[in-house]
């Protein structure tokens, strides 16, 4: 009887000691060519557009746990007070997975008031890769 209790305890310990390992998906979709979406007079994040208050989006928990990666290309305007407005997700891969955290983050961004009154059609690429969030060009 003790042998079976010991054997059962051993199987329980082995089962508990082997949680499913996190394995990120290595297939990251190629970044879009941001300038290809823009007109010659549009601003591009990291070039003519630089925030004075900036927070990166939070990597969604379910995307992180499932190893999902991707990017979001955002078009936005900056008003005369340096606040973001008219935020549009132009494209995202995988579609819709990262859109909500991107919108939440961009709504918090602040810029120095533009000298021309406002900046229109600014584009920003946000990458979600291997649990990290970064800006692209």
Predicted regions and their residues:
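Short proline/glycine- and basic residue-enriched helix-capping loop/turn segments at helix->loop/beta transitions
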Residues: 32-75, 100-137
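Bacterial Sec signal peptide processing site at the extreme N-terminus
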Residues: 16-33
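A short acidic/small-residue loop/turn micro-motif
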Residues: 61, 91-97
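Sec-dependent signal peptide recognition
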Residues: 1-9
